Swiss-Prot record:
One of its GO terms (cellular component) is cytoplasm. It comes from Methylobacillus flagellatus (strain ATCC 51484 / DSM 6875 / VKM B-1610 / KT). GO terms for molecular function: nickel cation binding. This is Urease accessory protein UreD. Required for maturation of urease via the functional incorporation of the urease nickel metallocenter.
């Protein structure tokens, strides 16, 4: 027992506590990053403007490349009225074996009136033995718009690795002027019913969700989204609620999931942002 406690303490000493807080403002039709707080290994690159001054693109980087047991990442973004930003990541997030400690990522976004934030990260890969807690809280003022997606890979598929040990806790909540309009929770272990059930993840190694909070979705947009098909062996679909549009992918390929969500984004963005989808340049590398 002493050896176990000693090893746990040693790992605790090495864990990262990372925080990145970003503040965006819109002045004279140009969105700029006006404030940044940074602690630990979580940084943002210089803002890019591939679609003009109104929308700035930011790339969130975690230099260590992977997240070990005990690491805690916090990403916060605050958008002032009418600001518009798109945030993404350069590559897949890697969540390593827990070593008796859980790792976490907490996302907190606050959007003022008529602002728009898109959070479109690459996939997260849960290594065998990982113990991970993801939480996302999005607070929207009147007229604010949020679009975000999340893709999880259970095990390193390219190596034939299965997620046979570990734990996942995932929570996402969206509020409009303090009122809860979306509340999604997932608790999974490799042998839990949710991983193999026909109403759960159906035994598939990749699970993805896309959420848009932008008010009532026009019928023609819903129909166009539902006409999009995901390739390969997959289960997918689009659900329209009074204040939320959500899409789900359950399948065997993270690339197919990203492709499916990007095609949905190409249909949705002209509606909620009044501009065509412009791929972040980092996606082409």
């Amino acid at each position: 027992m002493d050896d176990v406690n000693t090893k746990t303490a040693a790992w605790a000493d090495k864990r990262w506590q990372a925080l990145l807080a970003l503040d965006f403002s819109s002045r004279a039709g140009r969105t700029t990053l006006i404030g940044k707080r940074h602690q630990g290994p979580l940084v943002v690159q210089k803002m890019l403007y591939p679609e003009g001054d109104e929308v700035c693109h930011g790339i969130i980087i975690h230099p260590p490349g992977g997240v070990a047991g005990g690491d805690q990442l916090q990403l916060q973004a605050t958008l002032e009225a009418s600001a518009r930003a798109l945030l993404t990541t350069p590559g897949a997030g890697k969540w390593y074996k827990a070593n008796q400690l859980s790792a976490s990522q907490a996302v907190r976004f606050h959007l003022a009136a008529n602002s728009c934030l898109e959070w479109l990260p690459q996939e997260n890969i849960l290594f065998d033995g990982s113990n991970v807690h993801f939480s996302s809280e999005i607070d929207l003022a009147e007229g604010a718009v949020f679009c975000g997606w999340d893709i999880l890979c259970f095990g390193r598929q390219a190596r034939g690795e299965r997620w046979s040990e570990g734990e996942l806790r995932q929570v996402m909540q969206v509020r409009r002027e303090g009122r809860l309009i979306w509340n999604e929770r997932l608790f999974a272990q490799p042998d839990s019913l949710v991983m193999r059930s026909g109403i759960g993840l159906k035994g598939m190694p990749v699970n993805g969700s896309l959420v848009v909070a932008a008010g009532t979705v026009p019928v023609e947009i819903i129909e166009a989204c539902r006409a999009i098909e995901a390739r390969g062996d997959a289960h997918y679909g689009v659900t329209a609620l009074p204040e939320i549009l959500s899409a789900r992918y359950i399948g065997a390929s993270s690339e197919a999931a990203k492709e499916y969500f990007e095609r949905l984004w190409q249909v949705l963005r002209p509606w909620y942002a009044a501009r065509p989808a412009t791929r972040p340049r980092i996606w082409n590398t």
